[in-house]
Regions:
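Hydrophobic, Leu/Ile/Phe/Ala-enriched alpha-helical segments that form helix-helix packing faces
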Residues: 1, 54-62, 179, 183-191
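N-terminal low-complexity, intrinsically disordered segments
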Residues: 1-31, 35, 200-206
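Short amphipathic beta-strand starts and helix->beta connectors
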Residues: 19-23, 58, 138-143
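Glycine-rich, often proline-containing surface loops adjacent to acidic residues and nearby aromatics
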Residues: 25-41, 68-77, 152-164
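Hydrophobic alpha-helical segments and helix pairs
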Residues: 26-64
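A generic structural motif
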Residues: 66-68, 194
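Aromatic/basic-lined ligand-recognition segments
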Residues: 69-149, 157
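C-terminal structured interaction module
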Residues: 155-207
Length: 207
């Protein structure tokens, strides 16, 4: 990573250009947070190792300690390109049955314009370890009104989060490994089969 720049709001960003496969790593230092990412990694292990290296070095170079930590997140993102009404696709695919279906399919409804579910659960008794899933559409009211859609990414985000100060302290590396394991399990057993695949199949069918 050799591209270093400062954003208008003051953040420092270190990144690399896309390789032949579209992979790209980046690191951002905000006033109150360290953020890093690996876009389209060759495998999830590469992304995990990148995170481990950064989290191992950060406390020494930035003089960080347990009192500086609020929470650590591991986020998996899945992008599905779709040229159409993202909100309608989500409504038809994930909310076609159940009590909420009556709201979305009522005879007075002409279009779904904002269907972006955001769900969170605790996976620990102390509620310090949490998992969230969020679906983000990128369809505007103008596109729906004119029926002229751009091909854009419908995004599904899976977040595993751990808060500090509730249970016994652990190192950043240990927490990162634990959160990565949780995210891997949730992605493989729940998010991909229950959310990503149904949406991908609906897009492929031309819904």
């Amino acid at each position: 990573m050799r591209k270093l720049r400062r954003r208008e709001e003051g953040s420092l960003v270190l990144e690399e250009g896309d390789d032949d496969e579209g992979s790209r790593r980046w690191l951002r230092l905000d006033e109150d947070a360290i953020r890093l990412g690996y876009h389209s990694p060759p495998c999830t292990l590469d992304a995990q190792q990148f995170g481990q290296v950064v989290l191992k070095m950060a406390p020494y170079h930035l003089t960080l300690g347990d009192l500086d930590y609020d929470h650590l997140e591991v986020v998996y993102g899945f992008d599905l390109e779709y040229q159409g009404n993202h909100d309608q696709l989500v409504a038809d695919t994930l909310f076609s049955e159940g009590p909420l279906a009556g709201l979305l399919t009522h005879e007075s409804v002409t279009h779904a314009i904002d269907v972006q579910p955001f769900l969170g659960v605790s996976v620990s008794e102390s509620c310090d370890t949490q998992v969230y899933v969020e679906i983000k559409s990128h369809t505007s009211a103008y596109e729906i009104r004119t029926q002229q859609y751009d091909a854009q990414q419908l995004s599904v985000f899976l977040t595993a989060r751990k808060y500090w100060g509730i249970t016994e302290s652990e190192s950043l590396g240990d927490v990162h490994r634990a959160l990565t394991a949780i995210a891997e399990e949730w992605a493989a057993e729940r998010i991909v089969p229950l959310v990503v695949n149904p949406l991908a199949q609906a897009i492929a069918s031309g819904r």
